[in-house]
Regions:
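Periplasmic peptidoglycan-binding/tethering modules of Gram-negative envelope proteins
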Residues: 1-70
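Periplasmic OmpA-like peptidoglycan-binding domain that tethers envelope proteins to the cell wall
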Residues: 74-140
Length: 140
């Protein structure tokens, strides 16, 4: 099977759109399919920033275009704080993003929420730039 894809970026939201297929027996919906996004947080916070809200608006639009998509929200924290505290903080961050989606019309049934705390850093380092990249929710 040969599928041509176009990757489209809207803010920090990545969508993939199937454009054509060499296999005539398979039909592809031309609607954009949500792929991923990352929402960043301030130190020890689980509130959304204005930049995060813009990213989430784009994600809501992509999810509304294809109502069959299920998403996973994975909450993360930097390494400061105890393991237990960071797991709880990652959970609060993921729940905040979930609440935003639900308030904007995305069914809770389409959303899975989990936390990894500090266990899966995006960046290794002990400086503010590294910490900032690790304070996040990944939407997949």
């Amino acid at each position: 099977m040969n599928v041509t894809e176009e990757t489209v970026y809207s803010g920090d939201v990545k969508t993939v759109q199937a454009l054509s297929s060499a296999d005539d027996n398979i039909r592809y919906d031309s609607k954009a399919v949500f792929a991923s996004a990352t929402i960043y947080f301030e130190f020890d916070k689980s509130t959304l920033t204005s930049k995060s809200i813009q990213t989430l608006k784009s994600a809501v639009n992509a999810l509304n275009e294809n109502s069959s998509i299920q998403i996973t929200l994975a909450g993360h924290a930097d390494e400061r704080g105890t393991r237990e505290y960071n797991l709880a903080l990652g959970q609060r961050r993921a729940e905040t993003v979930s609440d935003y989606f639900v308030l904007n019309g995305i069914s809770k049934n389409r959303i899975t929420v989990k936390s990894f705390g500090e266990e899966r850093p995006a960046v290794i380092g002990q400086d503010e730039m590294s910490y900032a990249k690790n304070r996040r929710v990944e939407i997949n």
